[in-house]
Amino acid sequence: MTTNEQKKRIYLSSPHMSAEGYEKAFIEEAFATNWIAPLGPNVDSFERELAERVGVKAAVALSSGTAAIHLALKAVGVGQGDIVFCQDLTFSATANPIRYQGAIPVFIDSDHTWNMCPKTLKKAFEKYEAMGQKPKAVIVVHLYGLSADLDAIMEICREYDVPLIEDAAESLGSLYKGKQTGTFGDLGVFSFNGNKIITTSGGGMLVSNDEEKIKKARYWATQAREPVRYYEHKDLGFNYRMSNICAGIGRGQLRVLDERIAKKKYIFDYYKEHLSDLEGLEMMPIQDYDDPNCWLSCIILSTDRVKPTDIIEALEAENIESRPIWKPMHLQPYYQNCDFITLQEQGSVSEDIFNRGLCLPSDTKMTDEDLAKVTMVIRGLWG
C-alpha cells in the first residue's frame, strides 16, 4: 500500500445519504410492494414533492439531467438546423442535447458572475438578426450554484420572444432574489447525479409552470407510447423515465436538502475565512441578488506565484480531490467549429476563468479537521 493510499480520502463532492435512513425506508417500501420499475409511487411522489419544494406546477422525473435538457429543447420546438444560444462556461451535458436534436449551438461568453453575460447575449441576438436568423431557444446555466443575472437575461429573451431554458443542474436550493433558480424560464432542469447536492445515484427532473409541456415530456420519456390497449407510437420517444428505486432515494434526499445546503455554505465560509488573505486568491463571486447553494466552493487566482495545477497536485499528494473549472465549450474539440460570441477583443472571460479557476473539495461529509487539512496544504504553497 502506498503512502497516499494510507491517507484518508477527501472527496470533491460524493453521495451523502441521510443519517435517519430516509432513503432506505423508501427503497424497502418499493421492494415490499414490488414496484421495481421506471414508474411507481416513489416516482409520482418525488415529482410532486420536488415541484412543491421549488414552487412550480409540474415536474417529470427522468433518468438524467441531460435527458431533461433534451426534452426541454424538444418541448420548445427545437429541431434540425435550428440555432440555440447556450452558455459557454459549462459542462458538455448542457450543450450535447442541442446536437441530439440536430440543432446548432452558438456559445455565449460569461461575465463577472461566471455565468452568461447579458450584454453578450444581446450582441448574439443582434448579430443573428442582421443575418435574418433567430435562435429557437436560450440555455442559461447557474454555474456551481451561482445564479445567473436572470432579470437581464429574461428581458432580452422576452424582447426577441425566445424561450429560456434554465440548466439548474448545479443549483438546487440556490435562490435568485428569494426565488428558486430553475423556476424563472419556460422550463428548468435539475440533476441528481452522484456528485450533486442531493442524488438519486443518477437522475434528473424537468420542471415548469406549463403543465402541457411537462405532460408532453412525460409522454416522450415513456417511448411516446399512445394510451391505447396495444403498443402504438405516433412520435419518436425515449427511454428516459426514472426508476422507482432511484426516486425513493431522491425522496429521502429531499428531506435533508436544507442540511446539505447549510453544510455547503459552511464549507464555502470556512475557505473564505482561512484562504482569502492569500495574495492573488479570491473566492468565486456571489452577487447581491444571489443566495447560492455553494454546490462547489471555487477559487480564482491572479498570481504567477501559484497556479491551479500546483494546488491540484499538492492536494492530490495528500489524497484530496479537487478539479479545474469546466473547460469552455468553444474550446472543446467537438465544438471548435461552432460560433462563439464574446465582448473581448482577445481571449474570453470563460477561458480566463477556466485558466485561473479551481474547484476545492466541497463534500458535505467533510469535518473541520478535513477542512483544516485542505487549507493547510494550500497555504503551504504560499510559503
How would you describe each model-predicted region?
Residues 70-124:
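Conserved PLP-anchoring active-site segment centered on the Schiff-base-forming lysine
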Residues 96-98, 156, 197, 245:
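Hydrophobic/aromatic ligand-binding patch that stacks against planar heteroaromatic rings
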Residues 2-3, 41-48, 56-59, 119, ...:
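PLP-dependent aminotransferase class I/II
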Residues 101, 159-160, 318:
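Helix C-cap/helix->beta junction micro-motif
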Residues 1-75, 79, 140, 158, ...:
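Conserved PLP-binding active-site segment in aminotransferase class I/II-type PLP enzymes
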Residues 113-200, 205-207, 212, 307:
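Active-site phosphate-binding strand-loop segment of PLP-dependent enzymes
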